[in-house]
Amino acid sequence: MLNLFRGLALFLCVGTAWGIVLANQGDILTVRQFSKHVPGGDAGLHVAVMGTLTLVLGLAFSEARVFGSRLGFSRIVALMIAFATLEEWQQRLQPFRRFSFRDLLFSYLGIALAVLVFMLGRRLLARFRSPDRE
């Protein structure tokens, strides 16, 4: 089951990368049409995509081992912050895109919400797994 979930997480990463490539090549109209269906428009899309990626990658790979040590959720969050920053910054180099500090803040908000959901979920699981104290 974990391998299936990891495959889904990687598929989501590829889909996100494909959306970025389309936007960088000037197919921004497709992205804008899609963002009309997301509450909050483009800002909501940044929150949803970065939050979902962070949460799904964290759930799928936080216990994975890389070079003998556990990857951990905090490293995944650090990678997502770096990814969001670099993705927004690279838009300065693209003819059809522009850097937006607002978009970057909404990407960070999505990551922060994913961290909150992950931490609350872990606490709830720990509470339900521990024996009831009477």
Where does each model-flagged region fall?
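Bulky hydrophobic segments
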Residues: M1-R102, Y108, A112-E134
